[in-house]
Amino acid sequence: MDITITLDRSEQADYIYQQIYQKLKKEILSRNLLPHSKVPSKRELAENLKVSVNSVNSAYQQLLAEGYLYAIERKGFFVEELDMFSAEEHPPFALPDDLKEIHIDQSDWISFSHMSSDTDHFPIKSWFRCEQKAASRSYRTLGDMSHPQGIYEVRAAITRLISLTRGVKCRPEQMIIGAGTQVLMQLLTELLPKEAVYAMEEPGYRRMYQLLKNAGKQVKTIMLDEKGMSIAEITRQQPDVLVTTPSHQFPSGTIMPVSRRIQLLNWAAEEPRRYIIEDDYDSEFTYDVDSIPALQSLDRFQNVIYMGTFSKSLLPGLRISYMVLPPELLRAYKQRGYDLQTCSSLTQLTLQEFIESGEYQKHIKKMKQHYKEKRERLITALEAEFSGEVTVKGANAGLHFVTEFDTRRTEQDILSHAAGLQLEIFGMSRFNLKENKRQTGRPALIIGFARLKEEDIQEGVQRLFKAVYGHKKIPVTGD
């Protein structure tokens, strides 16, 4: 049988055996090589192509392994009988335009994003040292499947940490580690009653809202008052599960006082199977005031599901979060029996070493002071540039705050101009859970300062001024 194979012998080309393999596969699929026909012997094809027998043998062995050829002892290799494809071969696959990702190079942009941490000040060398120690100490653990809830010693380290820093009352057995809060929330929806009605803060965390909706859950929204979730609205709407961010309401920045926390706990205790999901968002960083302990620390009825993450205190890319389940839900979890751990064992063990070595608390202390100074410089620059035409809210905690501006421009106008000025920033409407809710009052923007470089503060504020007013301020009233 004559087979014509043209080989590319340039340095950039695929290996010779791969080219032979690809050509023969194509000939078989196109029926140019018919089923049960004999292909040339390895030596014959090698001589024809002026290549080594090993190259031809590697190609034949791959085709044999994939089922394109079969071998008969002392007779050689033959083409396997394959069904014809039911469709014609198309040109190289092209993704529809609406599914393509558009990459925008923002390396030269100034970022007021609320979704980041300050990577420039992350102690990467300390983290790598801890990783090396963890790998050396527990390398056998890396060869095993991790416990579904996470490695016990890691859960114990996190339990001690949140008991000390947040007042959370729990045992390691109650904790589940996962690769992000959304992963844990998805799991939680499967543990809570199927018919449970959820309620979230409005405005709030839209991704979590969409996760619940996509899971087929009924989700109500609760407007905020000056203390957080409105008790009157909760009483009126009668949900079964509240999702709240009491330490630093996302995105408004409100810190829920103890009086409202007690009201929420009493509400949960009024009826069986009511729960509060406490997303302890941004709890590590408070300024000018001491941290208020977690809502879970006040819980006397085991109705609070506590959720925490290391995305803000360390790095979002580590993807390590955790939740603490009340005994009733922990029992439901253990009865499932089919869950797998989603977080890397090495990341878990490195975190354990980072916490137990004291590096974590050292890092938090350093970053708290760093973020406080950066925040103060940013607010001072905003107030100076906008001459009293800006209101700052929710700046006592977390890595972002809310700003409202006296301007005729709408939020969308401001965001459009900001993008043109290479300024990354987001508006409050992004966090409206109800899509038909329209902007009322002054436009409000979320100002994140974690990623913002200190040397870019003044320039960033000046760009923001141009986005809000243009080159010349446009007053709200008057001509």
Swiss-Prot record:
Molecular function per GO: DNA binding; DNA-binding transcription factor activity; pyridoxal phosphate binding; transaminase activity
Keyword ATP-binding attributed: no
Record bears the keyword DNA-binding: yes
Highest taxon listed in the record's lineage: Bacteria
Annotated region of DNA binding: 42-61
CDD domains named in the record: AAT_like, WHTH_GntR
SS bonds (residue pairs): none
Occurrences of domain HTH gntR-type (ranges): 14-82
SMART domains associated with the record: HTH_GNTR
Matches recorded under Gene3D superfamilies: Type I PLP-dependent aspartate aminotransferase-like (Major domain) (3.40.640.10), Winged helix-like DNA-binding domain superfamily/Winged helix DNA-binding domain (1.10.10.10)
Cofactor field: pyridoxal 5'-phosphate
Keyword annotations: Activator, Aminotransferase, DNA-binding, Pyridoxal phosphate, Repressor, Transcription, Transcription regulation, Transferase
Pfam families the record matches: Aminotran_1_2, GntR
Role summary: Activates the transcription of the gabTD operon. Is also a repressor of its own expression, both in the presence and absence of GABA. Binds specifically to the DNA region overlapping the -35 region of the gabT promoter and the -10 and +1 regions of the gabR promoter. Principally regulates the utilization of gamma-aminobutyrate.
Protein name: HTH-type transcriptional regulatory protein GabR
Native species: Bacillus subtilis (strain 168)
Gene that this sequence comes from: gabR
